[in-house]
């Protein structure tokens, strides 16, 4: 198990840990925190929000579960200004931001490394049906969206140069692989 507390990683300051719904981003975030890293969950720590794609307006109280057709109009978006603030706060230590948003390309330039967690369809179905920390994916429309995006996420991030990690493995191994990706980029343990 690799552990560290706020260590500057040879110039790498901000790592984006992304992947489809159900790949384990929030779980990885929690383990990174437990190991002493600065790790933030984009879903829980105010980095993302629902927006109306037609108007750009923020959705203050989104429905849960979403009704049919809702995801065609509304999207989960990351707020660039929040990530820019995190970049400034992370100049002397490494930080991990864990999440996924449809406008990730708008903030990709702010990250020193992108890690994409991937899982197979059976694992995705199982995780979305049984997870207790987030209800997204239990409703048929949400599940359909997650299944549609699962193969696309890997392709998008591989093309963009991300480090792809098989997140169907035990979480400690997945987190070790995330840390190894940072070490591989910097030549030192984060």
Model regions and ranges:
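Hydrophobic anchor at the beta1->P-loop junction of P-loop NTPases
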Residues: 17
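Conserved phosphate-donor/acceptor-positioning beta-strand/loop module used by diverse small-molecule
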Residues: 110-131
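Glycine-rich phosphate-binding loop used to anchor ATP phosphates in small-molecule kinases
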Residues: 66-111, 117-118
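ATP-binding Walker
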Residues: 23
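Walker A/P-loop
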Residues: 26
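Conserved substrate/cofactor phosphate-moiety recognition/catalytic segment
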Residues: 30-81
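P-loop (Walker A) phosphate-binding loop of NTP-binding proteins
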Residues: 20
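Small-molecule kinase domains that catalyze NTP-dependent phosphoryl transfer to phosphate-bearing small molecules
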Residues: 104, 130-180, 185
């Amino acid at each position: 198990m690799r552990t560290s507390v706020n260590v500057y990683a040879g110039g790498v300051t901000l790592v984006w840990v992304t992947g489809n719904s159900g790949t384990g981003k929030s779980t990885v975030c929690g383990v990174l925190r437990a190991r002493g890293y600065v790790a933030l969950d984009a879903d829980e720590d105010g980095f993302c929000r629902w927006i109306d794609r037609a108007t750009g307006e923020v959705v203050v109280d989104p429905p849960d579960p979403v009704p049919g057709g809702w995801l065609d109009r509304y999207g989960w978006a990351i707020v660039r200004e929040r990530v820019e603030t995190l970049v400034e706060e992370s100049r002397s230590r490494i930080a991990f931001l864990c999440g996924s948003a449809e406008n990730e390309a708008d903030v990709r330039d702010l990250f020193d490394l992108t890690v994409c967690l991937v899982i197979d369809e059976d694992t995705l179905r199982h995780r979305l049906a049984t997870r207790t920390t987030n209800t997204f994916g239990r409703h048929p429309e949400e599940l359909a969206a997650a299944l549609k995006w699962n193969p696309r996420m890997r392709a998008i991030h591989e093309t963009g140069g991300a480090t792809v990690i098989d997140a169907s493995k035990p979480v400690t191994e997945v987190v070790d692989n995330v840390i190894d990706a940072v070490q591989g980029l910097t030549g030192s343990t984060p």
